[in-house]
Protein backbone atom coordinates (compact mmCIF):
# COMPACT_ATOMS: atom_id res chain seq x y z
CA UNK A 1 0.00 0.00 0.00
CA UNK A 2 1.24 3.46 -0.88
CA UNK A 3 -0.03 6.24 1.34
CA UNK A 4 0.32 9.90 0.60
CA UNK A 5 0.84 12.30 3.44
CA UNK A 6 1.57 15.96 3.82
CA UNK A 7 4.05 17.26 6.40
CA UNK A 8 3.15 20.16 8.65
CA UNK A 9 6.19 21.85 10.15
CA UNK A 10 5.24 23.01 13.63
CA UNK A 11 8.53 24.44 14.89
CA UNK A 12 12.10 24.95 13.77
CA UNK A 13 13.49 25.45 17.28
CA UNK A 14 16.08 22.79 18.05
CA UNK A 15 18.51 22.12 20.89
CA UNK A 16 20.73 19.93 18.72
CA UNK A 17 23.92 20.79 16.90
CA UNK A 18 23.67 18.29 14.03
CA UNK A 19 26.35 19.29 11.55
CA UNK A 20 24.16 18.57 8.50
CA UNK A 21 20.88 20.21 9.56
CA UNK A 22 19.43 23.64 8.87
CA UNK A 23 17.65 23.56 12.25
CA UNK A 24 21.04 23.35 14.04
CA UNK A 25 20.80 25.49 17.19
CA UNK A 26 23.87 27.47 16.16
CA UNK A 27 22.35 28.57 12.85
CA UNK A 28 21.25 32.17 12.94
CA UNK A 29 17.76 31.77 11.49
CA UNK A 30 14.36 33.12 12.43
CA UNK A 31 12.77 30.58 14.80
CA UNK A 32 9.06 29.96 15.02
CA UNK A 33 6.50 27.75 16.71
CA UNK A 34 3.08 27.73 15.09
CA UNK A 35 0.24 28.99 17.25
CA UNK A 36 -2.91 26.86 17.54
CA UNK A 37 -4.64 29.27 15.17
CA UNK A 38 -1.85 28.81 12.61
CA UNK A 39 -1.95 25.03 13.06
CA UNK A 40 -5.72 25.06 12.49
CA UNK A 41 -5.40 27.13 9.31
CA UNK A 42 -2.53 25.04 7.89
CA UNK A 43 -4.22 21.74 8.75
CA UNK A 44 -7.46 22.90 7.14
CA UNK A 45 -5.59 23.87 3.96
CA UNK A 46 -3.94 20.42 3.90
CA UNK A 47 -7.25 18.62 4.50
CA UNK A 48 -8.93 20.74 1.82
CA UNK A 49 -6.34 19.43 -0.67
CA UNK A 50 -7.67 15.94 -0.01
CA UNK A 51 -4.96 14.63 2.30
CA UNK A 52 -6.20 12.31 5.04
CA UNK A 53 -2.77 11.58 6.53
CA UNK A 54 -0.64 14.31 8.08
CA UNK A 55 2.91 14.16 9.43
CA UNK A 56 3.68 16.61 12.23
CA UNK A 57 7.35 17.62 12.03
CA UNK A 58 9.44 19.78 14.35
CA UNK A 59 12.94 20.44 15.51
CA UNK A 60 13.90 18.84 18.81
CA UNK A 61 13.19 21.45 21.46
CA UNK A 62 10.90 20.32 24.28
CA UNK A 63 11.21 23.82 25.76
CA UNK A 64 9.48 25.36 22.74
CA UNK A 65 7.37 22.44 21.50
CA UNK A 66 6.96 19.69 24.06
CA UNK A 67 4.51 16.92 24.76
CA UNK A 68 1.74 19.29 25.94
CA UNK A 69 2.05 21.38 22.77
CA UNK A 70 1.89 18.25 20.59
CA UNK A 71 -1.09 16.93 22.56
CA UNK A 72 -2.98 20.16 21.89
CA UNK A 73 -2.07 20.08 18.19
CA UNK A 74 -3.15 16.45 17.78
CA UNK A 75 -6.46 17.00 19.58
CA UNK A 76 -7.09 20.12 17.49
CA UNK A 77 -6.54 18.46 14.10
CA UNK A 78 -7.76 14.93 14.89
CA UNK A 79 -11.23 15.51 13.38
CA UNK A 80 -9.63 16.48 10.04
CA UNK A 81 -7.40 13.44 9.44
CA UNK A 82 -7.71 9.66 9.38
CA UNK A 83 -4.07 9.29 10.41
CA UNK A 84 -1.78 11.58 12.38
CA UNK A 85 1.94 10.81 12.36
CA UNK A 86 4.71 12.52 14.27
CA UNK A 87 8.38 13.09 13.57
CA UNK A 88 9.54 15.06 16.58
CA UNK A 89 12.07 14.61 19.40
CA UNK A 90 12.35 11.15 20.98
CA UNK A 91 10.27 10.92 24.16
CA UNK A 92 9.69 8.75 27.20
CA UNK A 93 7.05 6.02 27.21
CA UNK A 94 4.86 8.22 29.42
CA UNK A 95 5.04 11.18 27.02
CA UNK A 96 4.34 8.97 24.02
CA UNK A 97 1.27 7.58 25.82
CA UNK A 98 -0.10 11.12 26.09
CA UNK A 99 0.19 11.51 22.31
CA UNK A 100 -1.37 8.11 21.59
CA UNK A 101 -4.30 9.01 23.85
CA UNK A 102 -4.61 12.34 22.03
CA UNK A 103 -4.98 10.51 18.70
CA UNK A 104 -1.52 10.04 17.17
CA UNK A 105 -1.13 6.79 15.20
CA UNK A 106 2.45 6.67 13.92
CA UNK A 107 5.87 7.80 15.06
CA UNK A 108 8.89 8.04 12.79
CA UNK A 109 12.46 8.36 14.01
CA UNK A 110 15.64 8.38 12.00
CA UNK A 111 18.69 6.96 13.73
CA UNK A 112 20.68 9.01 11.20
CA UNK A 113 23.59 6.53 11.35
CA UNK A 114 23.93 3.20 13.10
CA UNK A 115 27.70 3.60 13.45
CA UNK A 116 28.01 4.38 17.15
CA UNK A 117 31.63 5.49 16.74
CA UNK A 118 30.93 8.13 14.08
CA UNK A 119 27.53 9.20 15.49
CA UNK A 120 29.04 11.83 17.86
CA UNK A 121 30.85 13.49 14.96
CA UNK A 122 27.48 14.33 13.38
CA UNK A 123 25.63 14.99 16.67
CA UNK A 124 28.19 16.67 18.95
CA UNK A 125 25.75 18.37 21.37
CA UNK A 126 22.10 18.44 22.27
CA UNK A 127 19.41 15.88 22.96
CA UNK A 128 20.30 13.92 19.85
CA UNK A 129 23.85 13.33 21.09
CA UNK A 130 22.55 10.38 23.15
CA UNK A 131 22.94 7.51 20.65
CA UNK A 132 21.32 4.85 22.84
CA UNK A 133 18.27 6.96 23.77
CA UNK A 134 17.60 7.59 20.08
CA UNK A 135 18.20 3.95 19.14
CA UNK A 136 15.66 2.77 21.72
CA UNK A 137 13.00 5.29 20.67
CA UNK A 138 10.99 2.82 18.54
CA UNK A 139 10.81 0.44 21.52
CA UNK A 140 9.40 3.19 23.75
CA UNK A 141 6.93 4.30 21.08
CA UNK A 142 5.63 0.74 20.62
CA UNK A 143 5.42 0.22 24.38
CA UNK A 144 3.36 3.41 24.62
CA UNK A 145 0.81 2.02 22.16
CA UNK A 146 1.70 3.47 18.78
CA UNK A 147 0.18 1.19 16.13
CA UNK A 148 2.84 2.11 13.59
CA UNK A 149 6.52 2.88 14.12
CA UNK A 150 8.91 3.88 11.34
CA UNK A 151 12.70 3.90 11.37
CA UNK A 152 15.41 4.93 8.97
CA UNK A 153 18.95 6.12 8.46
CA UNK A 154 20.16 9.28 6.78
CA UNK A 155 22.13 7.61 4.03
CA UNK A 156 25.41 9.34 3.29
CA UNK A 157 26.54 10.21 6.81
CA UNK A 158 28.44 6.95 7.03
CA UNK A 159 28.79 3.95 4.73
CA UNK A 160 25.33 3.69 3.18
CA UNK A 161 25.49 -0.09 2.77
CA UNK A 162 26.32 -0.55 6.44
CA UNK A 163 23.56 1.82 7.54
CA UNK A 164 21.04 0.11 5.24
CA UNK A 165 22.06 -3.27 6.66
CA UNK A 166 21.73 -2.11 10.26
CA UNK A 167 18.39 -0.44 9.52
CA UNK A 168 17.17 -3.84 8.29
CA UNK A 169 18.55 -5.53 11.42
CA UNK A 170 16.84 -2.92 13.59
CA UNK A 171 13.57 -3.58 11.78
CA UNK A 172 13.99 -7.33 12.23
CA UNK A 173 14.57 -6.80 15.95
CA UNK A 174 11.48 -4.57 16.25
CA UNK A 175 9.23 -7.04 14.48
Question: What are these language model-derived features?
Answer:
Residues 1, 172-175:
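Short, intrinsically disordered, charge-balanced linker/junction segments flanking boundaries
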Residues 2-4, 84:
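Generic structural signal for residues in well-ordered beta-strands
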Residues 5-38:
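Canonical Radical SAM [4Fe-4S] cluster-binding loop centered on the CxxxCxxC motif
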Residues 27-173:
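Conserved Radical SAM active-site core
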Amino acid sequence: TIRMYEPLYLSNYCHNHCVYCGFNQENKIVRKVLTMEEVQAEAKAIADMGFTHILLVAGESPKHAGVEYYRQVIELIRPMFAQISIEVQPMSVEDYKVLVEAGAHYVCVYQETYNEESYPRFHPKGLKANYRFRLETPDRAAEAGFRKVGIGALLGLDNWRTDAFFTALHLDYLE
